[in-house]
Amino acid sequence: MRNFISIKELSKEEVIEVLDVAKELDNADSKERRKIMDGMIMTSIFFEPSTRTRLSFTSAAYRLGCKELGFDNPEQSSVKKGESLRDTIIMVSAYSDIIVMRHSIDGAAKFAEEVTNCPIINAGDGANEHPSQTLLDLYTLREELGTIENQKVAFVGDTRYGRTVHSLVDGLMMFNGQFYFISPDVIQIPDYILKELDNANIKYKKLSNYEEVLKEIDCLYMTRVQRERFDDINEYEEVKHAFRISKDNIVGKCKDDMIILHPLPRVDEINIDLDDTKYAKYFIQARNGVPTRMAMMALATDAIKSKVKRKEMNYEVVENKEVVCPNNKCVTHFEETKNRVVKKGYGDFCYYCNREIGK
């Protein structure tokens, strides 16, 4: 049994194994594939709205022969009555062979892991991480570009709150990626992520426009500006239309084999006139969520046995009840946690939401 909480907890070999298993399952005989998780139950608990992630996990479960329980509206669950996340996870575990959870609180998935032995897949926790999106992004990059080694990726839009950006950066770090973060200052990439990149000697630049790097990059990764992450509506209004791309500013101005990805949903950041160009891979990317999530579920439950060694985390974790995470959207402010702190050579970080302590 294993959990998929953070892409940081996977080794390069484990990532490659997930992608290889996803490819095998995508090409497998459907009748044989339905035997893999026959008799198992997946419970999906979504505390935030979702279309692609929730439906692709459901599709993945059915294709593996797995039954599904769950909710996608916490208003229709005991959460509305005041039930804690701790109690929700404990109860759901009693009915499940695997839990898929999305939550609005940063670090919720890491906390859930502490209170159950049931395998958990993090389907997005606030502005923190989204490992299943990262793995399907890596799968798409490998399928479309032939490799995920040494790719130059420009992240455009909301790099501050974009959990898909944060997780994909962590994933591509293993493969010597090079990054461009293109955002208005108010939604630019957080310093705690840049500290990780600096420590790993990964090349990156913060820029205010994407045009200057179109001839260099292998992938243009667009994101929407997320209204739900802003406390100040005025900040959102100032930046919500910061970047828009169309045929006029892409075709003939980028590398011939560059691809455009987007975790979706899009608002107006990608004009539909790009949809039928060779650069647009975002709908293929969304489709790739099914085989990737099949692989994650099968490996998490040991329905398919992993053949690679589990990554050993080489940092110290301590419990410190006196430490307060500076992120007011961290699970430590909503649940009774063990208040763990990760001690690294370049700083102390919240075990749950990854924010630097003391910043």
Swiss-Prot record:
Enzyme Commission numbers on file: 2.1.3.2
Pathway(s) served: Pyrimidine metabolism; UMP biosynthesis via de novo pathway; (S)-dihydroorotate from bicarbonate: step 2/3
One GO MF term attached to the UniProt entry: aspartate carbamoyltransferase activity
InterPro entries, per database record: Asp/Orn_carbamoyltranf_P-bd, Asp/Orn_carbamoylTrfase, Asp/Orn_carbamoylTrfase_sf, Asp_carbamoyltransf, Asp_carbamoyltransf_Asp/Orn-bd, Asp_carbatrfase_reg_C_sf
Binding site for L-aspartate: K81, R163, R224
Pfam families: OTCace (PF00185), OTCace_N (PF02729)
Catalysed reactions, as listed in the record: carbamoyl phosphate + L-aspartate = N-carbamoyl-L-aspartate + phosphate + H(+)
SUPFAM superfamilies to which the protein is assigned, alphabetical: Aspartate carbamoyltransferase, Regulatory-chain, C-terminal domain (SSF57825), Aspartate/ornithine carbamoyltransferase (SSF53671)
UniProt-listed Gene3D superfamilies: Aspartate/ornithine carbamoyltransferase (3.40.50.1370)
UniProt keyword Transferase, yes or no: yes
Sorted UniProt keywords: Pyrimidine biosynthesis, Transferase
UniProt GO BP: 'de novo' pyrimidine nucleobase biosynthetic process; 'de novo' UMP biosynthetic process; amino acid metabolic process
GO CC terms: cytosol
Family statement: Belongs to the aspartate/ornithine carbamoyltransferase superfamily. ATCase family.
Name of the featured protein: Aspartate carbamoyltransferase catalytic subunit
Natural source organism: Brachyspira hyodysenteriae (strain ATCC 49526 / WA1)
Source taxonomy: Bacteria, Pseudomonadati, Spirochaetota, Spirochaetia, Brachyspirales
